[in-house]
């Protein structure tokens, strides 16, 4: 007789690791279909787990989703399979690490036409660090351009596995998916049976429900959680009542108890989004565990940018929208700030540029807030002449040059996987971006893994787009933070009629300051509309102007009525016009269009 699926040795918790577009979400759909969690008629949209419009549109998974499937294996026993879907993009590696901590196994999905990509390798190392059982899967084997054996050799070189342990599937056509599920049952270890220990549960994701408050998705690692228990969160020591607990099989299914090994959800009327920190440990308040689960780290934003509402009266709407977004996104950090040019807004910290774009799009789409974004920048460390250290995440906070001793900037270690034909192009791009070339490994006869060290500031802009264009889309990249290093950095200010515009300031390397200033002045000249008076656009480092462009004034032809006539009369009219323009210039403020703030993002185009 089949044992009830709640038995801990009949649970399999696993995730899927893959690069963008390698077919992860489609594979998840096939698993849901084969285990009868969903039938085809319910699949109104492909990629059931990617439930944000943005996720489907960009073909990426942003949030960690979890779903429970029941499966009767070939041994006649019933198993509970918990699939935790993970994002595959470089910016979301923290989401991946949290999802991995909730699993015992991982499917390493590689596209048969693309081979191993940089992000796959990065997430694979995270999975190996977490001690997960890896099941390699080659997907899209039915495509005419697939190279199954070549990709298999890459995987064997990467993790030293036997050829017959690599599975071959086509998620779209449903080929090999049954064998894959059987492999999950046989190869992924069951969770440890720790029911007798004090409760410890890991929160790997959370969403905000307008009726129920925060819903925390968790994996029970030790102990038992019952409905009505008083639970305590380690990060802030707050105590809540477990109003509802249960499991997720696409929709929430309430249950009375969750035991060690289970993946489920917890609702306990948490009003403040910050109380259910993703990565936190939940325990019982009456008989608490002594220490939290390891592996949780406060997420560190790498890229900072100012977000300002286009209409200043939408400031409160922007605040509310950011609060709601921050609930579903543990990695978004924001603090209020003011700008002379843009008014009230927020300085936000993001994991990377894709993360920043997604937050901006979600603010505009889901919450209807129109925003202006300032130039993205990184966090600098400024050592003053008196020995104090100041952290600068906004160019306007940069101290006066006379007080600065040294400036340090964050460096990252980057691996770029590409075809060997593009090595020259990538080396050139690396040199342009102040990169330090380390070495190159050959993955096979045509693909290489190049290692560089870059200042983070040089890659947060448009590095990924440039890399894709010079390699015709074949290169993929992954980076991780190393340390801070000393650099010759300066603050470049933009002045309009001698008035600095704080939102256009930027911190750049001294060697690039002149070129950057010249390009920016030229770009702004084409964007800022003509005024009734002359407008001087200047780029300056401290008090030294390094570049200038002038927008000439719109002028009425005051001599139109002087047919011929006395020169002194004409001169008098021109002098009068000049006086008027001068007065206008003193009181007038140059209206800066929104495109001017975006100009910096596309300075090279």
From Swiss-Prot:
Cellular component annotations (GO), alphabetically ordered? plasma membrane
Gene Ontology process terms (BP): positive regulation of translation
User: What SUPFAM superfamilies does the annotation carry?
Assistant: EF-G C-terminal domain-like, P-loop containing nucleoside triphosphate hydrolases
tr-type G domain residues: 9-192
Q: Look up the domain of life of the source.
A: Bacteria
Arranged from A to Z, the UniProt key words for this protein are: Cell inner membrane, Cell membrane, GTP-binding, Hydrolase, Membrane, Nucleotide-binding, Protein biosynthesis
Locations listed in the record? Cell inner membrane
What InterPro entries does the annotation carry? EF-4, EFG_III/V, EFG_V-like, EFTu-like_2, LepA_C_sf, LepA_CTD, LepA_IV, P-loop_NTPase
Q: Its catalytic activity?
A: GTP + H2O = GDP + phosphate + H(+)
Q: Which Pfam families match?
A: EFG_C, GTP_EFTU, GTP_EFTU_D2, LepA_C
Principal cellular location given in the protein's record? membrane
Q: What EC number(s) does the entry state?
A: 3.6.5.n1
Question: What are this entry's molecular-function GO terms?
Answer: GTP binding; GTPase activity; ribosome binding; translation elongation factor activity
Q: How does the protein's chain sit in the membrane according to the entry?
A: Peripheral membrane protein
Record-annotated residues binding GTP?
21-26, 139-142
UniProt enzyme class: hydrolase
Q: What does this protein do?
A: Required for accurate and efficient protein synthesis under certain stress conditions. May act as a fidelity factor of the translation reaction, by catalyzing a one-codon backward translocation of tRNAs on improperly translocated ribosomes. Back-translocation proceeds from a post-translocation (POST) complex to a pre-translocation (PRE) complex, thus giving elongation factor G a second chance to translocate the tRNAs correctly. Binds to ribosomes in a GTP-dependent manner.
Family to which this protein belongs: Belongs to the TRAFAC class translation factor GTPase superfamily. Classic translation factor GTPase family. LepA subfamily.
**What name appears for this protein in its UniProt entry?**
Elongation factor 4
Annotated organism of origin: Chlorobium phaeobacteroides (strain DSM 266 / SMG 266 / 2430)
Identify the gene encoding this protein: lepA
């Amino acid at each position: 007789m089949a044992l009830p699926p709640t038995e801990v040795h009949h649970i399999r918790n696993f995730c899927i690791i893959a690069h963008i577009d390698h077919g992860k979400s489609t594979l998840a759909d096939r698993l849901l279909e084969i285990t009868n969690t969903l039938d085809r008629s319910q699949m109104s949209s492909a990629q059931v787990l990617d439930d944000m419009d943005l996720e489907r549109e960009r073909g990426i998974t942003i949030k960690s989703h979890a779903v429970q499937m029941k499966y009767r294996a070939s041994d006649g026993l019933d198993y509970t399979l918990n699939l935790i879907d993970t994002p595959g993009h470089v910016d979301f590696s923290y989401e991946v690490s949290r999802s991995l901590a909730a699993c015992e196994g991982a499917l390493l999905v590689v596209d048969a036409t693309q081979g191993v990509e940089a992000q796959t390798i990065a997430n694979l190392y995270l999975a190996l660090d977490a001690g997960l059982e890896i099941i390699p899967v080659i997907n899209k084997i039915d495509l005419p351009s697939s190279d199954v054996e070549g990709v298999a050799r890459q995987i064997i070189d990467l993790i030293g596995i036997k050829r017959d342990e690599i599975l071959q599937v086509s998620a779209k056509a449903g080929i090999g998916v049954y064998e894959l599920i059987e492999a999950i049952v046989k190869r992924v270890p069951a969770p440890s049976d720790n029911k007798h220990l004090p409760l410890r549960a890991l929160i790997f994701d959370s969403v905000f429900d307008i009726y129920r408050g925060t819903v925390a998705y968790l994996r029970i690692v030790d102990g038992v959680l019952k409905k009505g228990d008083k639970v305590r969160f380690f990060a802030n020591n707050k105590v809540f009542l477990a109003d509802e607990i249960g499991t997720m099989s696409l929709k929430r299914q309430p249950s009375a108890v969750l035991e060690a090994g289970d993946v489920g959800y917890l609702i306990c009327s948490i009003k403040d989004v910050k109380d259910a920190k993703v990565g936190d440990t939940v325990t019982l308040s009456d008989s608490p565990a002594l220490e939290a689960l390891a592996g949780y780290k406060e997420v560190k934003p790498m890229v900072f940018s100012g977000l300002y509402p286009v209409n200043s009266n939408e400031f409160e709407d922007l605040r509310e929208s950011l609060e709601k977004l921050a609930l579903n996104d543990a990695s978004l950090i924001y603090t209020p700030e003011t700008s002379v040019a843009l008014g009230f807004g927020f300085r936000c910290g993001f994991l990377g540029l894709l993360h920043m774009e997604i937050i901006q799009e979600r603010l505009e789409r889901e919450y209807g807030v129109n925003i202006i974004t300032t130039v993205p920048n990184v966090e600098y460390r400024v050592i003053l002449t008196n020995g104090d250290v100041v952290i600068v995440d906004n160019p306007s906070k940069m101290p006066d040059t006379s007080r600065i001793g040294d400036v340090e900037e964050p460096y990252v270690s980057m691996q770029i996987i590409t075809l060997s034909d593009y090595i020259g192009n990538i080396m050139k791009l690396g040199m342009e971006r102040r990169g330090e070339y380390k070495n190159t490994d050959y993955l096979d006869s045509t693909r290489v893994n190049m290692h560089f060290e870059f200042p983070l500031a040089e890659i947060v802009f448009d590095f990924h787009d440039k890399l894709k264009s010079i390699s015709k889309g074949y290169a993929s990249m992954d980076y991780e933070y190393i340390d801070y290093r000393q650099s010759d950095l300066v603050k470049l200010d933009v002045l309009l009629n001698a008035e600095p515009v704080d939102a256009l300031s930027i911190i750049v390397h001294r060697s690039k300051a002149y070129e950057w200033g010249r390009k920016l002045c030229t770009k702004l000249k084409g964007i800022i509309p003509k005024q009734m008076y002359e407008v001087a656009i200047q780029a300056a480092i401290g008090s030294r102007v390094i570049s200038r462009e002038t927008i000439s004034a719109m002028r009425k032809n005051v001599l139109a009525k002087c047919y011929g006539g006395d020169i002194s009369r004409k001169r008098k009219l021109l002098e009068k016009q000049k006086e008027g323009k001068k007065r206008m210039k003193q009181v007038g403020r140059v209206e800066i269009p929104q495109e001017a703030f975006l100009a910096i993002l596309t300075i090279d185009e």
